[in-house]
């Protein structure tokens, strides 16, 4: 009986020991599991190699990025100005890769020539967001694009000329930086939708700047008579539009003599509508800061993002320009 009792208690001890040895295993595993930490804006380092400061639009875009970074309290914004030179942008991207930033948000000055730099960023494990303009590189080399539908902007401009010149005519085109996504897209959209009875008489680049648009418009006016040889001008951004107005004024052209459609929707563009120079201004919103930082934080935390995020935009007209001008943020 004693032997049986001893065997019973020994057996019971062993069973309890085995159970006790197994039961905490799950608890130990849970305790030892790596803790997943979610990064916040305070942990985020973002590189923004801005393409330049060529226009009011670009100035507003820079302000949106900087102001949003400050408001969100991000760890570091690595900002640079490439002065509209791709080689400067590429150098800035490579410097950010060497610095091991979390995300690169790139507003490319032109579409082509980005494969090498984007490949380097991808190999370094740094996601790249293409901002504003587009690139021709393999989409697998960057995480997403945030910006405007430049082709649609050109199509909207064409629709305005189709309405204003129902019997046909001829227009001039002041285009943006050669090879840039904005210039390529707007030119393509414009040609997609322009009625066949409206001829594009001539097209020259003003490089998206007010200063360069003046001599281009002056050269146009030496070759073609306003109202006779051409009835309208499609201008790829408001800064060039303001430069064109300067040349038109000097040549004795008055507001309303020509049909002018611009792109951007800046304060300068609204003033040109108020003054009777622009008949329409196709919106292109530069205030992309909140969207850029929201997407950047999702990317560093492994979240899914949309490959293409297009801003919601419209077309503005002179009849509302006076009322809306004081409310414009850029």
Sequence positions of predicted segments:
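Hydrophobic alpha-helical
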Residues: 106-122, 190, 202, 207-271
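Short beta-strand elements at the ligand-binding edges of bilobed clamshell
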Residues: 79-81, 137-160, 173-177, 203, ...
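Short, solvent-exposed amphipathic alpha-helices that sit
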Residues: 57-72, 153-157, 181-199, 212-216, ...
């Amino acid at each position: 009986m004693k032997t049986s009792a001893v065997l019973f208690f020994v057996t019971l001890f062993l069973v309890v020991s085995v159970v006790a040895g197994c039961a905490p295993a799950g608890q130990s595993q849970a305790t030892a599991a790596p803790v997943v930490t979610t990064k916040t804006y305070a942990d985020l380092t973002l590189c923004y190699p801005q393409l330049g400061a060529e226009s009011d639009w670009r100035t507003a875009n820079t302000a949106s990025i900087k102001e949003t970074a400050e408001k969100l309290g991000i760890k570091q914004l690595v900002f640079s100005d490439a002065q509209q030179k791709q080689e400067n942008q590429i150098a800035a991207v490579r410097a950010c890769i060497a610095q091991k930033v979390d995300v690169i948000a790139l507003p490319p000055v032109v579409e082509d020539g980005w494969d090498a730099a984007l490949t380097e960023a991808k190999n370094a494990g740094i996601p790249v967001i293409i901002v504003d303009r587009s690139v021709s590189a393999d989409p697998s080399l960057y995480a997403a694009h945030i910006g405007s539908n430049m082709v649609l902007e050109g199509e909207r401009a064409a629709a305005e000329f189709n309405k204003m010149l129902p019997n046909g005519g001829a227009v001039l085109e002041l285009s943006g930086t050669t090879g840039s996504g904005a210039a390529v897209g707007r030119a393509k959209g414009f040609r997609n939708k322009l009625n066949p009875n409206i001829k594009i008489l001539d097209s020259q680049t003003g490089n998206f700047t007010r200063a360069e648009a003046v001599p281009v418009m002056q050269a146009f006016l030496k070759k073609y008579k306003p109202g006779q040889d051409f009835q309208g001008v499609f201008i790829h951004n408001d800064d060039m539009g303001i430069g064109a107005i300067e040349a038109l004024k000097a040549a004795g052209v008055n507001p309303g003599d020509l049909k002018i459609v611009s792109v951007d929707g800046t304060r300068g563009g609204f003033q040109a509508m108020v003054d009777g120079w622009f008949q329409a201004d196709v919106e292109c919103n530069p205030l992309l800061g909140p969207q850029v930082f929201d997407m950047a934080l999702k990317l560093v935390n492994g979240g899914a993002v949309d490959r293409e995020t297009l801003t919601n935009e419209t077309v503005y007209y002179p009849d509302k320009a006076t009322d809306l001008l004081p409310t414009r943020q850029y």
